[in-house]
Amino acid sequence: MVKVIDVGRVVVKVLGREAGRKAVVVDIVDENYVVITGPKQLTGVRRRRVNVNHIEPTDKKVEVKRGASDEEVLKAVEAAGLADYMRERVKPQMFGITASEVR
């Protein structure tokens, strides 16, 4: 599994109400936080700052610039042919356990 979290990386949220949904990293705040977006109309994940421990990177990446708008991210996802992939929900796994076991 890819461990690099960079701008444009597709990630899966592993904790919270959006657990199992995919999003795209659009900005890196610091070593602990990144800004992600679904965008909401595609995956249901709204733009927000998240702790890097609450996301799991995938091997997919889209070409977006840092701070890209939701519309730019949506166009990049569709151009990369990942729209259906982004809509799929997954059972998140974090360190070998599922998010439902983390309570």
UniProtKB/Swiss-Prot annotation:
A single GO molecular function term of this UniProt record: structural constituent of ribosome
Annotated keywords: Ribonucleoprotein, Ribosomal protein
GO cellular component annotations of the record: cytosolic large ribosomal subunit
Domain of life: Archaea
BP terms from Gene Ontology: ribosomal large subunit biogenesis; translation
NCBIfam families for the chain: PRK04333.1
Family: Belongs to the eukaryotic ribosomal protein eL14 family.
Protein name: Large ribosomal subunit protein eL14
Organism: Pyrobaculum neutrophilum (strain DSM 2338 / JCM 9278 / NBRC 100436 / V24Sta) (Thermoproteus neutrophilus)
Upper classification of the organism: Archaea, Thermoproteota, Thermoprotei, Thermoproteales, Thermoproteaceae
Gene giving rise to this polypeptide: rpl14e
